């Protein structure tokens, strides 16, 4: 009889402990995005978005890093900076269009050469995506994952990417063609001045803008085109 009383008392204590903890634990799990049915959904969505970004990043980097990846794509082509557009216009009228074209081509070649290095800087944003981030992105617009990605990586990516772009610019002769172009201008237009320009900053910024633009296009494809969902996970998450 004493043993039965002991078990009944233990059961009562355990039930009381469960009742006391049930509310707070449910709240904690909910805050973590892990409660009930939504936990599996959120983890699946997060995994799908990470995979979409992974696939999209690879496709975007492949697209822009090939020859003419920037130069032949009018949406992301790096053109003459606004600060020296007047210089380019004057030179073109004076018969030096070839020098202007060479300068534009060299900037785009530098971006194409540097682009493959960008992929290695994207891993952190994949790993740090929370379930809450994933849910908002999934329910957002056609490029919401890209915008999230950009907000999380752009500053860090710029700092890491700029030296690579600068090195590429030296290799393809951007600075050389720029100086030649400015030299032609100052010779043709006596006493003319040319506004100072940070070419490294300009090309790096434009190269990243172009990369994120193409990544956004890849995200749109995955969201809207079944043929772009190249894995079972992408088909599962975005096919519903």
Tell where the protein language model's regions lie, with residue ranges:
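Residue-level signature of catalytic and energy-coupling elements of molecular machines
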Residues: 60, 130, 226
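Bacterial N-terminal signal peptides that target proteins for export
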Residues: 1-8, 18
């Amino acid at each position: 009889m004493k043993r039965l009383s002991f078990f009944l008392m233990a059961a009562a204590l355990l039930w009381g402990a469960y009742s006391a903890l049930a509310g707070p634990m449910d709240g904690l799990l909910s805050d973590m995005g892990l409660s009930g049915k939504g936990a599996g959904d959120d983890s699946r969505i997060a995994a799908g978005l990470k995979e979409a970004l992974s696939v999209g990043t690879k496709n975007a980097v492949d697209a822009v890093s090939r020859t003419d990846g920037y130069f032949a794509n009018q949406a992301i082509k790096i053109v003459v900076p606004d600060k020296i557009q007047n210089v380019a216009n004057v030179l073109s009228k004076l018969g030096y269009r070839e020098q202007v074209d060479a300068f534009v081509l060299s900037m785009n070649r530098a971006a194409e050469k540097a682009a493959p290095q960008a992929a290695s800087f994207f891993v952190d944003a994949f790993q740090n995506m929370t379930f809450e981030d994933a849910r908002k992105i999934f329910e957002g617009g056609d490029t919401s994952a890209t915008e999230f990605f950009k907000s999380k990586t752009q500053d860090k990516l710029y700092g890491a990417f700029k030296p690579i772009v600068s090195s590429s610019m030296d290799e393809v002769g951007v600075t050389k063609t720029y100086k030649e172009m400015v030299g032609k201008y100052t010779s043709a237009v006596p006493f003319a001045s040319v506004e100072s320009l940070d070419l490294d900053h300009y090309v790096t910024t434009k190269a990243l803008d172009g990369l994120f633009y193409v990544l956004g296009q890849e995200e749109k494809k995955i969201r809207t085109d079944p043929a772009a969902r190249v894995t079972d996970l992408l088909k599962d998450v975005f096919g519903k």
